[in-house]
A protein has these predicted regions:
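Conserved beta strand-loop-helix elements of the APE1-like EEP
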Residues: 1-3
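Domain-core and long-helix interface of multi-subunit machines
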Residues: 5-134, 149-150, 215-227
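C-terminal functional module detector
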Residues: 105-111, 115-232
Length: 232
């Protein structure tokens, strides 16, 4: 939602991010620990400049990077390309560790996912082969937003609601390939108000963390890298 040409400014990333923030836009570090896939001549495109500050968030789960990570030989490449449900395992461990590291330093950083879909259609004789179909990628992994009010159909108003929730991190990453995550809720309640992810509130008079999970699952509440409690 930046609305400006940015590639020519890549030599001064901090200046670019500062300008993004001035315009109330969003800066997300994509596939920060991406690995290459030499068999397909796919280069490694990780994020390496961790000196920058004040970016909005980083991707902790990217399906395109996950394909490369889980494809170690030609047989796995073919299998994963033909059966897209076979390769997504979960969020990138290195990205989770980096996110946790930043949070433990008191740096507010949001977590995002990316379908990073690259549907390809190939013809093999009379056959038409579709790999990485959009329908699969856009349903397997999603950023779910907590918007403060129902979308109205007014484009400008709804865009502001959506972008604002993305900007402050009022959202969660849902690995919907495993099970639908719609209906998951995580919020803090206290002082006659609720605070959703990305929001702040005083804990002076006590706060209750509430979690609603749409299906039976294992739930871990983690703080500063430590599991405070686990439910099954």
């Amino acid at each position: 939602n930046y609305g400006k040409e940015a590639s020519s400014r890549s030599s001064d990333l901090q200046n670019l991010i500062d300008d993004v923030n001035k315009t109330q836009s969003i800066s997300i570090l994509a596939h920060p620990f991406d690995q290459g896939l030499s068999l397909l001549r796919e280069p490694s495109i990780p994020w390496t400049n961790w000196e920058i500050k004040n970016f909005t968030g980083l991707e902790i789960f990217n399906l395109s990077s996950e394909f490369k990570t889980q494809s170690h030989n030609i047989f796995q490449i073919v299998k994963n390309a033909l059966d897209q449900k076979s390769f997504p395992v979960g969020p990138d461990e290195n990205s989770i560790v980096k996110w946790d590291e930043l949070l433990c330093k008191g740096i507010a950083v949001n977590a995002y996912s990316a379908s990073d879909a690259h549907q390809k259609v190939r013809r093999i004789g009379p056959f038409r082969l579709i790999t990485f179909p959009y329908a699969f990628h856009f349903s397997a992994l999603n950023n779910h937003l907590y918007v403060p009010e129902k979308l109205s159909g007014n484009l400008l108003k709804d865009k502001e609601l959506i972008y604002n929730s993305l900007r402050i991190g009022r959202s969660f990453v849902g690995f919907d390939l495993v099970a639908p995550t719609t209906g998951f809720r995580f919020f803090a309640e206290g002082e006659n108000r609720k605070a959703w992810p990305g929001e702040r509130m005083s804990i002076r008079n006590g706060v209750t963390i509430k979690i609603d999970i749409p299906q039976e699952s294992i739930c871990r509440l983690i703080h500063n890298g430590n599991v405070l409690r686990q439910w099954e």
